[in-house]
């Protein structure tokens, strides 16, 4: 993830996007949702979203229209004028996802996008992510929820101690593990340890 964000230079190998060498400054529009969330918590929800929309090249009117529509979609329409620090952690996370997908980025990097959500809100957010995928966005995300992998992903890499323990299409990984489910594969690789799984 850090290489995709331009924070690290890869020691070897290549980063390709649509078959071309990938550079952060290469014109690919990017949306990033970090695991550690961070927005301007003393500002109102609508002001924060409009501000980030303008940073992403949207007009103020476009950013406001998108923000209000999105807040309605995630059941936060009544929070538009509330300061972010008055929202729950889950509500703030919904706002941050909205900021991440503003202006339809070509590449979405999501680090634990549904962490801490109940099943209802997890499904809601995964519906939104799936819509971005269907609209043509490339999505790279870290998750420990194998049902999300089964639903959304074409390829996966499971890392342990910095080494890839499984990589390929979902079908090829299952075949490698004798047809096991992704849940069973995760348990086999990580046992009782917390693992890191990156999917696209």
Kindly label every feature range from the protein language model:
Residues 167-168:
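ABC ATPase "signature
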Residues 149-151:
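A short, surface-exposed alpha-helical micro-motif characterized by mixed small hydrophobic
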Residues 50, 54, 61-79:
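Conserved ABC ATPase "signature" region
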Residues 5:
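Helix-to-loop junction immediately C-terminal to a conserved catalytic motif
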Residues 13-28:
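Conserved ABC transporter NBD signature motif
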Residues 108-112:
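Catalytic Walker B motif of ABC-type/P-loop ATPase nucleotide-binding domains
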């Amino acid at each position: 993830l850090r290489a995709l964000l331009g924070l690290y230079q890869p020691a070897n190998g290549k980063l390709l996007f649509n078959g071309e060498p990938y550079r952060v400054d290469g014109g690919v529009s990017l949306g990033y949702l970090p695991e550690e969330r961070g927005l301007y918590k003393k500002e109102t929800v609508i002001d924060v979203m409009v501000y980030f929309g303008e940073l992403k090249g949207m007009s103020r009117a476009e950013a406001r229209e998108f923000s209000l529509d999105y807040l309605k979609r995630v059941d936060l329409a009544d929070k538009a004028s509330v300061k972010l620090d008055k929202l729950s952690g889950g509500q703030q996370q919904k706002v941050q996802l909205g900021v991440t997908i503003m202006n339809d980025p070509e590449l979405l990097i999501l680090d634990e996008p549904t962490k801490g959500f109940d099943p209802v809100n997890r499904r809601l957010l995964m519906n939104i992510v799936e819509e971005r995928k269907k609209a043509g966005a490339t999505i790279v995300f870290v998750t420990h929820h194998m049902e999300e992998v089964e639903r959304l992903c074409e390829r996966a890499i499971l890392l342990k101690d910095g080494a890839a323990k499984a990589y390929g299409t979902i079908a090829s990984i299952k075949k490698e593990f004798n047809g096991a489910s992704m849940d069973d594969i995760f348990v086999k690789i990580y046992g009782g340890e917390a693992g890191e799984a990156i999917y696209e």
